[in-house]
């Protein structure tokens, strides 16, 4: 089921990064995560967004390229400064990693040095639930190999423009 020997570039946002321990899959049929542009805040370089995992994944990740010049984001009353990731598959991206999402909608305000329409990026939702056609993988394991938080992961990746 899982290739434990070879590495493979499997993420559209990181074509040069090769992952270990991957499995071929067919379409899960799951609904992609959603991102709604609520509004551009007049007189600023900020935009309000709403993110949601439509399959109730535990984690949602927003990736914006370094060229977007993201300064910070607001979630609730908190402002969080950001920096570009310099390692791993998220290298070259601003990374907003939200955990514990499930069925919740998340409102964010993104603050840019200079906002330009059509900033391209990626929205990911990450879950430990695998597609139905991989149920036999669970059955083939003994109890010692049951998944953990960083074990099995199914990731939906959506190309976005904001």
Residue ranges of predicted features:
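Extracytosolic and intramembrane catalytic regions of membrane-associated proteins
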Residues: 1-162
